[in-house]
Amino acid sequence: MARAFPLERVRNIGIAAHIDAGKTTTTERILFYSGVVHKIGEVHDGAAVTDWMAQERERGITITAAAISTSWQEHRINIIDTPGHVDFTIEVERSMRVLDGVIAVFCAVGGVQPQSETVWRQADRYSVPRMVFVNKMDRTGADFLKVYDQIKDRLKANAAPIQLPIGAEGDLSGIIDLVSNKAHIYKNDLGTDIEETEIPSDMAEKAAEWRSKLMETVAETDEELIESFLENGELTIDQLKKGIREGVLKHGLVPMLCGSAFKNKGVQLVLDAVIDYLPAPIDVPPIQGVLPSGKDDVRPSEDNAPFSALAFKVMADPYGKLTFVRMYSGVLEKGSYVLNSTKDAKERISRLVVLKADDREEVDQLRAGDLGAVLGLKNTTTGDTLCSTDDPIVLETLFVPEPVISVAVEPKTKGDMEKLSKALVSLAEEDPTFRVSTDQETNQTVIAGMGELHLEILVDRMLREFKVEANIGAPQVSYRETIRSSSKGEGKYARQTGGKGQYGHVVIEMEPGEPGSGFEFINKIVGGVVPKEYIGPASNGMKETCESGVLAGYPLIDVKVTMVDGSFHDVDSSEMAFKIAGSMAFKDGVKKCNPVLLEPMMKVEVEVPEDFLGSIIGDLSSRRGQVEGQSIDDGISKVQSKVPLAEMFGYATQLRSMTQGRGIFSMEFSKYEEVPRNVAEAIISKNQGNS
């Protein structure tokens, strides 16, 4: 079967931003103007095509990354609409991993918000080229150039406006295209009748000034363009387009567009810019991976290369389990067998589909550069690599943030226990930041996630999709433990029962690991003092012991262990004996290494009228918060701070009462930090009292 669109005419893009910037409305308009939908769906009416979960339509927020295919100017555009709420940051993370370009949507009034910075960092982590759409130019207080300044200052991006709005707020009537040096005037409310004209005389001077700035910025990205610019005093339209595109692909330039998706202005120009400036799969570096030999390798974005794909999302679906994949190389055929190289398991491809939100089109094959979904996979989860059985490779996986909040959950009736277990397994398969465990002391089922809204929506889904009514306990903070110094640890396990004994002996050196490294094990046993077959069990014993630290039973992180010595017995030694000895050595070492308790710190930004600033700062300080910055703009104070999650429960209610309902705040995970001694002692004694 021939390819419907050549690779250079494919764009895999994401639409990302902070909550309420208008991402989903922008996506809806893209689908309307490109002919996928024939009437406009509004988020606030609960009719958006990409918001297809019941809770999304009710709450007017996007929870999951919906993938949709459309076409524009003879190009295939695969779009992922991502959530802006911080509790669903994994959805943004996994979509960034598989995208080639991003449209970052900003509100013309709110500008750069804390969640905008998070999304920007995620795009940086995966080196995703991007452009900016400043939306909501029809709103009171809209200011395109203020957002431009914020993007340069707060995101440190080389932003370059390639458009200017004609009018603003209620008077937004059109858009100046600085590249073509023309104005686009909107003649009807649907945004389908657009007249291209000369730039209005009252804006000619401003447009000339910004066009000159654009030429200068673009010329700086390329030596040939600099020469041409210095020689001729300007760049041609073709040179401008080529320079902007190259600047975007090299991450040296971020073009800025403007409009109002809700008022149907500017969206077709966004689509034109996606094609002109964002990369095709062949414009980005080939995906990197590791061969079975341990050697690094790459897979070029070509149909005739060996097949490789990354599973970036798993979803329970009325038709069975849907696994979303990004095709990196080769061709995937319906009915074929492939290798899950992450788990070393064979999988059969039952059916292949391309999605238009909750509508799907069955296809016989997916090709390099495509985004699609597979039915029939049994063992594949988020972040796994699928590849050809003849040419195995493991692709770079996803970064998954640790959950920061947990609650106990139990079914309302005993008969629902099995249904609850199935629901939790299914939800955990879909969402890597949702963890399920059993509390060893109380035997309760504990679920953990990225925030209160995250867990609330998952509990809601249990009821809607799995018909399980559950009781939820009070939220608990996910503390961690780590070590601050180095020491040796020793574990000797020797038992004599009847004829056969048990013997294992392990000596380790322990030291703090790099932040984010988790548990790191190095084997330095020489001369066979401990046989190879016992090293793995000893390491496993230590890794399992990490799950429950010595202070208060919280997981131990960022620990580096080197096994340096030990002994064994020809007859009595066994894998189990060395697993126990490894665990004993680990516990012995941790106690000598100055163990400390860590807590999740949250980045909290509060916006309040100026009059309330003093009481807000006082309240944050009483919550062990550290104020890191503040600013005042038009009588509204913004306070940036870092506050322990443990002190933030119920903050929304408190803020409402302190500001008479006029304050808003956003919160996202920052990092784990050491708990002050007096607070740590209270947590430890409470946990030891419960055990």
UniProtKB/Swiss-Prot annotation:
Q: Report the main location listed first in the record.
A: cytoplasm
- Top-level taxon of origin: Bacteria
Give the matching InterPro entries: EFG_II, EFG_III, EFG_III/V, EFG_IV, EFG_V, EFG_V-like, EFTu-like_2, G_TR_CS
Which compartments is it annotated to reside in?
Cytoplasm
User: Which residues are involved in binding GTP?
Assistant: 17-24, 81-85, 135-138
Under the GO molecular function aspect, what terms does this record hold?
GTP binding; GTPase activity; translation elongation factor activity
Q: Name one GO cellular component term.
A: cytoplasm
PROSITE patterns on file: G_TR_1, G_TR_2
Query: What biological-process terms (Gene Ontology) are attached?
Result: ribosome disassembly
Which keywords accompany this UniProt record? Cytoplasm, Elongation factor, GTP-binding, Nucleotide-binding, Protein biosynthesis
**Which intervals hold domain tr-type G?**
8-282
**Its function?**
Catalyzes the GTP-dependent ribosomal translocation step during translation elongation. During this step, the ribosome changes from the pre-translocational (PRE) to the post-translocational (POST) state as the newly formed A-site-bound peptidyl-tRNA and P-site-bound deacylated tRNA move to the P and E sites, respectively. Catalyzes the coordinated movement of the two tRNA molecules, the mRNA and conformational changes in the ribosome.
Q: Which family does it belong to?
A: Belongs to the TRAFAC class translation factor GTPase superfamily. Classic translation factor GTPase family. EF-G/EF-2 subfamily.
Put simply, this protein is called Elongation factor G
Gene symbol here is fusA
